[in-house]
């Protein structure tokens, strides 16, 4: 399965132990990962400004993701006008990377899941998917 994680899931995986860390580890071990340039940029900003991690730690996370995931940097724009520009970019990059699933905690993205061309699930929903649920 090709998996794309939104920024909020990756931040939670880095910042805390719990379901987000578990699903990211499971995806790294068992599936193919893609990451969009938008997520890489947002992740760096959050790690540096909100979590106040050192630049070296943010660089390490960026390098880790680039090593273990395919980076999607170009994607055609989407028409989901009810989404913020960054959310549209995250979804567009997931689609361009042929993700089977976008895992996010973003309520706006989860709200349009039924109309999206790929599966969009919460971290808990992805955990259930991994476990055959």
Model regions and ranges:
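Short, well-structured N-terminal submotif of metal-dependent ribonuclease cores
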Residues: 1-35
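A secondary-structure boundary/capping signal
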Residues: 6-7, 36, 105-106, 122
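Conserved glycosyltransferase catalytic-site signature
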Residues: 7, 87-88
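Short, flexible loop segments at the rims of nucleotide/cofactor-binding pockets, characterized by
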Residues: 10-13, 77-83
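PIN-domain endoribonuclease scaffold, especially VapC-family toxins
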Residues: 24-81
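Acidic, PIN/NYN-like endoribonuclease modules and their adjacent C-terminal/linker elements
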Residues: 81, 88, 97, 101, ...
């Amino acid at each position: 399965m090709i998996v794309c994680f939104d920024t909020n899931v990756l931040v939670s995986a880095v910042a805390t132990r719990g379901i987000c860390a578990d699903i990211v580890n499971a995806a790294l071990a068992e599936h193919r990962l893609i990451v969009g340039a938008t997520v890489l940029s947002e992740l760096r900003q959050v790690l540096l400004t909100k979590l106040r991690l050192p630049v070296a730690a943010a660089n390490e996370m960026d390098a880790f993701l680039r090593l273990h995931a395919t980076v999607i940097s170009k994607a055609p724009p989407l028409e989901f006008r009810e989404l913020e520009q960054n959310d549209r970019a995250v979804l567009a990059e997931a689609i361009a990377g042929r993700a089977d699933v976008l895992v996010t905690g973003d309520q706006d993205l989860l709200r349009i899941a039924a109309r999206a061309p790929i599966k969009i699930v919460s971290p808990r929903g992805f955990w259930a998917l991994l476990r055959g649920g």
